[in-house]
UniProtKB/Swiss-Prot annotation:
GO terms for biological process: glutaminyl-tRNAGln biosynthesis via transamidation; translation. NCBIfam families: gatB, PRK05477.1-1, PRK05477.1-2, PRK05477.1-4. Pfam families: GatB_N, GatB_Yqey. Gene3D superfamilies: 1.10.10.410, GatB domain, N-terminal subdomain (1.10.150.380). Its EC number is 6.3.5.-. One of its GO terms (molecular function) is asparaginyl-tRNA synthase (glutamine-hydrolyzing) activity. This is Aspartyl/glutamyl-tRNA(Asn/Gln) amidotransferase subunit B. It is an enzyme of class 6 (ligase). Keywords: ATP-binding, Ligase, Nucleotide-binding, Protein biosynthesis.
Length: 476
């Protein structure tokens, strides 16, 4: 029996504001517990929320970048539930009138393009954080309480884990390039909840959905959905029923584990937030934000391919993060050849980042240093082999490439008046190689190049040496 999967995603992004959504408390990742809170975050009696309007500006940027319809009037609502990390016993969110609806993102999977709908996106406050100690006590940190979130809810348009992965990748890229969030999953500024149901192929009615919450990597999203697909298929094939439930992904086993069975969708008794007035969004403000939107990743891709002439694959690798793309643009602006800059960034720089598990913002190599090194390669000042040594020094210690090359005597020997006599002597001293060359043995010239490189301790310009050797051998 064949089955069809239906997948939906809810993605929470921490909006990059200096203070919280309803209080003046600062937002700093990694701060000591409960040091970035005040009476509003604690829900002390009589305090009132004060809206940080910058969250709307950032949210509108994402809405515009995802072709979403921005509602002219929005308001906040109370989602009622009790948990220790929620001192008010309700969360301020947008339920009835969210920020935006009916957007979409286009993805490409297995060579085919598909449009994934965005049901809505709404602004809300984050909850605090519970930590369960080994001594039997639980501790609450309210630093995260009130941090502004933008929740993007997809339509259930994805039909397999690869489509979900592609959607997440594209959504993360879009949000990051707007500057609305830094989308760092390792710091919790991007969190993913998934739901998946399966049904026999041809059946219109959707199956019973299973939720998985707070998946902390794209790989976990893909693996958990793939496992859950197979698990639900086995349940149905054995004559059982899939339970409406919440499960978690166990990274060690690669399986999902039941957390709780649900009898139905939770009733949070939503009602309008009485302490915050409805928010009117003027079209003139939307137009102003639209004009100030940064260049999108799709626009950059077109520029890289058409103006810079690099391959689409190289452009896609560069555009995986905004930091990488900004680094590349700065290197080209500093005079680097676009193709060589793309090659060095995607191979040597990314190789160093992966090996050392750091981001491009953590390295000491600057775009200007990379550009300087590439210019020296192109004008023949250094060879590609020497360039790798220069690159290692610059990326580890921030050393200026030009100064390092000069101080270490690494300048490539390209002077024909010096190399010419050396070539003539090497050819004279190796008559067998000359004979081999005349007989069509191409390896002969490689041997002669090696002799020159040996005499110059690797400093001779291979391109110039090859040109001189070919000219000399042709004359014999």
């Amino acid at each position: 029996m064949n089955f069809k999967s239906t997948i939906g995603l809810e993605v929470h992004f921490e909006l990059k504001t200096k203070s919280k959504i309803f209080s003046p408390s600062p937002v700093t990742y990694g701060a000591e517990a409960n040091t970035e809170t005040n009476v509003i975050d604690w829900a002390m009696p009589g305090v009132l929320p004060r809206l940080n309007k910058d969250v709307y500006r950032l949210g509108i940027m994402v809405a515009l970048a995802t072709h979403s319809h921005i509602l002219p009037v929005t308001h906040f609502d109370r989602k009622n539930y009790f948990y220790p990390d929620n001192p008010k016993a309700y969360q301020i969110t947008q339920f009835f009138q969210p920020l935006a609806r009916d957007g979409y993102i286009e993805v490409e999977v297995r060579g085919k393009k598909k449009r994934i709908g965005i049901h809505e996106m709404h602004i809300e406050e984050d909850a605090g954080k519970n930590t369960h100690g080994a001594n039997g006590y639980s501790y609450v940190d309210l630093n995260r309480q009130g941090v502004p979130l933008l929740e993007v809810v997809s339509e259930p348009d994805m039909e397999d884990p690869e489509e979900a992965y592609a959607y997440l990748t594209k959504l993360r890229q879009i949000v990051q390039f707007t500057g609305a969030s830094d989308v760092k999953m390792e710091e919790g500024s991007m969190r993913v909840d998934t739901n998946i149901s399966i049904r026999p192929a041809g059946q219109e009615k959707l199956g019973t959905k299973v939720e998985m919450k707070n998946l902390n990597s794209f790989d976990h999203v893909r693996r958990s959905l793939a496992y859950e697909e197979k698990r639900q298929q086995q349940v149905l094939l054995s004559g059982g029923r899939v339970q409406l439930s919440t499960r978690r992904f166990d990274e060690a086993t690669g399986k999902t584990v039941l957390e709780r069975v649900k009898e139905g969708d939770a009733d949070y008794r939503y009602f309008p937030e009485p302490d915050i007035a409805p928010y009117h969004i003027k079209q003139s403000w939307i137009d102003e934000i639209a004009e100030s939107l940064p260049e999108s990743p799709f626009e950059r891709r077109k520029r890289y391919v058409k103006e810079y002439g690099i391959k689409e694959y190289d452009a896609d690798v560069i555009l995986q993060t905004k930091e990488s793309s900004d680094f590349y643009d700065a290197a080209v602006a500093a005079g680097a050849d676009p193709t060589l800059a793309a090659n060095w960034l995607n191979t040597q720089v990314n190789g160093y980042l992966n090996e050392n598990q750091v981001g491009i913002a953590d390295i000491k190599l600057t775009p200007e240093h990379l550009a300087e090194m590439i210019k020296m390669i192109k004008d023949g000042t250094i060879s590609s082999k020497i360039a790798k040594k220069v690159f290692k020094e610059s990326i580890e210690n921030g050393t200026d490439p030009k100064k390092y090359v000069e101080d270490k005597g690494m300048v490539q020997l390209s002077d024909v008046s010096v190399l010419g006599p050396m070539v003539t002597k090497v050819v004279d001293d190796n008559p067998q190689s000359v004979e081999d060359f005349k007989n069509g043995k191409d390896r002969a010239i490689g041997f002669l190049v090696g002799q020159i490189m040996k005499q110059t301790r690797g400093k001779a310009n291979p391109k110039v040496v090859n040109q001189l050797l070919n000219k000399e051998l042709q004359s014999r």
